[in-house]
């Protein structure tokens, strides 16, 4: 019971993201379901682990597309709370963030944002093309209780398969930069971003440097060097 009291004291800081107390109540129950469930059966696992009746199933579903939850405000509350709950790993005065993309296979025929995706890192266990969601995520590097470092997820968004405007010509790199800036502006701190070689691009580096942030990554192998032709 002591653990749940501490848990609730933490979750209450997310209250500004909900327009009504009832909406916040169902969000708390949803978070409880995520923390306690023993299987990955979706909303059904929430109903099962919380010992609710079947009527609660649709209540949980309504929360995920409810206008009573402000996603941007919820993300800002969580990003701000992470600096209180955890001891962030720093390089100088900079917070260290990790960024990566993931393609999650989905089989739902009518599931929103599912599209035909190409996986650059195909292997024997990963097909080259899949149907699924393409997401990009940012985490905060923190000190663990045992002296190790851990990554705390901050935010994640589906960046392919959703078209809000035909005039939106942003690439995945541009969308990741915007996602990072939405996190950094909440902290009002400079960030050191660590990412793989896919993000070693001018579209990432230039906006970061303009805002005072930095990128640590592996250089791509597509650079070309040459010597001038000697005079004969």
PLM region spans:
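Extended hydrophobic secondary-structure segments that form protein cores and membrane-embedded regions
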Residues: 96-99, 153-157, 192-196
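A short, flexible helix-boundary coil/loop motif
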Residues: 1-26, 34, 143-162, 168-173, ...
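An internal, acidic/charged active-site-proximal segment
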Residues: 161-232
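Gly/Ser/Thr-rich loops at beta-strand to alpha-helix junctions
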Residues: 37, 103-105, 197-201
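Active-site-proximal, Lys/Arg-enriched surface segment
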Residues: 66-148
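Gly/serine-rich nucleotide phosphate-binding loop at the start of the catalytic core
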Residues: 1-65, 71-78
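Electropositive, glycine- and tryptophan-enriched low-complexity nucleic-acid-binding patches
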Residues: 53-62, 67, 121-190
């Amino acid at each position: 019971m002591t653990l749940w009291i501490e848990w609730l004291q933490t979750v209450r800081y997310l209250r500004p993201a909900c327009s009504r107390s009832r909406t916040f109540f169902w969000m708390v129950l949803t978070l409880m379901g995520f923390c306690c469930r023993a299987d990955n059966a979706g909303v059904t696992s929430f109903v099962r682990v919380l010992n609710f009746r079947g009527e609660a199933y649709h209540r949980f579903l309504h929360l995920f597309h409810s206008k009573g939850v402000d996603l941007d405000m919820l993300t800002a509350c969580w990003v701000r709370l992470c600096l209180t709950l955890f001891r962030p790993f720093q390089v100088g005065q900079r917070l260290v963030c990790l960024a990566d993309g993931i393609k999650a296979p989905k089989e739902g025929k009518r599931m929103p944002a599912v599209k035909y995706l190409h996986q650059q890192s195909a292997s024997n266990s990963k097909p080259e093309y899949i149907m699924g969601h393409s997401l990009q995520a940012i985490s905060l590097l923190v000190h663990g209780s045992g002296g190790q470092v851990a990554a705390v997820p901050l935010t994640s968004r589906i960046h392919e398969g959703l078209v809000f405007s035909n005039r939106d010509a942003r690439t995945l790199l541009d969308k990741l930069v915007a996602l990072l800036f939405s996190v950094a502006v909440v902290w009002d701190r400079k960030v050191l971003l660590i990412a793989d070689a896919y993000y070693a691009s001018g579209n990432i580096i230039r906006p970061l440097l303009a805002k005072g942030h930095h990128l640590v990554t592996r250089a791509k192998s597509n650079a070309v060097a040459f010597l001038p032709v000697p005079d004969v």
